Regions:
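The conserved beta1-alpha1 loop
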Residues: 36-40, 107, 262
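Conserved HGGG/HGGXW glycine-rich cap/lid loop of the alpha/beta-hydrolase fold
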Residues: 20-79, 93
């Protein structure tokens, strides 16, 4: 049923909810305590399989494909509500399957989805795990630890168009530096690490639906640097600061414990991220950058830490675990170190 071959022990199924038809991977006993996994951008549930299979006894792993990724029904992604729609889609799976209280885990963009899910469904959560998550103020368009907008239209926003073209064409090779496989090797993980299931992970990336309604979404001309702002459709607008703000995570009640795990050498989510146009402008890779005062690199880690510190000030608790010599996907790169922290968190 899964486009990408699954590991032994992983079950693939389609779950028709009242919102859409969702592809779900699962493992473990049906009566086990559920652990719900949400993948990041340009990937799918495939990325979680090893982590699911490594769950301690008594846990049931469930990983969803978000709309526009993997084998889930590719409903359009609305720029203004896209992240909330992802969270509502995930919730519809929980309700359709009759999942009781559960743990939830989100990677990268999926971390932002989990934040919104927690804001709406905190009482059902046993714990929250954020793995190299997008900032609570999104990716692009914000500055400062408090997530203030850089410009009122969401600029700067954008992605390398060559990567999008190569994704759309199904490129699997290494010839082009922006090929999906090279982006996986250079940014999803820290070189020289190469995942054992690299071919499956590349196939997962290639399930991403391409276009204005999906990835990367549309953009509109802007008088602000670099001349483009997020439009009203697709993924990049959905997680831009213009439309995304999950800082309300600090105020949820009740407050399940939060584990924030990140790779020490993550190039995708950091305070100087390689896909942040402001950082690229600062280093001279995008011309015309207006300077630090107007458009500084987005301090993604500082923003996340500020919201989690507010969560603590409001009576919650979180732990930040930094995994050395790992990039954006420590659960793939350093599974023993990741699972040690993750399983301890699950077991309370």
């Amino acid at each position: 049923m899964s486009t990408v071959p699954t590991l032994p022990g992983i079950t693939s199924q389609m779950v028709q909810t009242d919102r859409l038809n969702v592809h779900v991977l699962s493992c473990g006993p049906e009566e086990g305590t559920a652990v719900l996994f949400v993948h990041g951008n340009v990937s799918s549930a495939t990325y979680w399989e090893e982590t699911m299979l490594a769950l301690p006894d008594g846990y049931r792993g469930l990983a969803v494909d978000l709309r526009g990724y993997g084998d889930t029904e590719a409903l359009p992604i609305n720029g203004a509500t896209g992240m909330a729609d992802f969270a509502a889609d995930v919730r519809s799976v929980v309700e359709t399957l009759g999942v009781g209280k559960h743990h939830i885990v989100g990677h990268s963009m999926g971390g932002g989805v989990v934040m919104l899910y927690a804001i709406n469904h905190a009482a059902d959560l046993l714990s929250i795990t954020l793995v190299d998550p997008v900032s609570p103020y999104g990716y692009g368009g914000s500055k400062g630890a408090n997530g203030a907008m850089v410009y009122d239209d969401g600029a700067p926003s954008g992605i390398n168009p060559e990567f999008v073209t190569l994704l759309a064409s199904g490129e699997r090779g290494l010839e082009n530096p922006m090929s999906p496989r090279n982006v996986l090797r250079g940014f999803y993980v820290k070189p020289p690490f190469i995942p054992a299931r690299e071919d499956a992970l590349v196939e997962s990336m290639l399930t991403t639906k391409i276009g204005d309604d999906h990835y990367p979404g549309n953009a509109v001309p802007s008088t602000n640097w670099p001349g483009a702002a997020p439009g009203d459709k697709g993924v990049l607008p959905a997680f831009n600061r213009k439309y995304f703000d999950a800082s309300g995570l600090a105020n949820i009640d009740p407050k399940p414990p939060i584990l924030w795990v990140r790779g020490a050498d993550d190039l995708i989510v950091s305070d100087y991220a390689m896909f942040d146009l402001a950082a690229l402008g600062h280093m001279g890779a995008v011309p015309g950058w207006p300077g630090d005062e107007e458009c500084p690199p987005q301090p993604m880690l500082a923003q996340t830490r500020a919201v989690l510190d507010n969560f603590t000030a409001n009576g919650g608790s979180y732990q930040e675990v930094v995994i050395e010599d790992a990039g954006h996907s420590p659960y793939l790169e350093k599974p023993a170190a990741f699972n040690a922290a993750f399983h301890k968190h699950l077991n309370g």
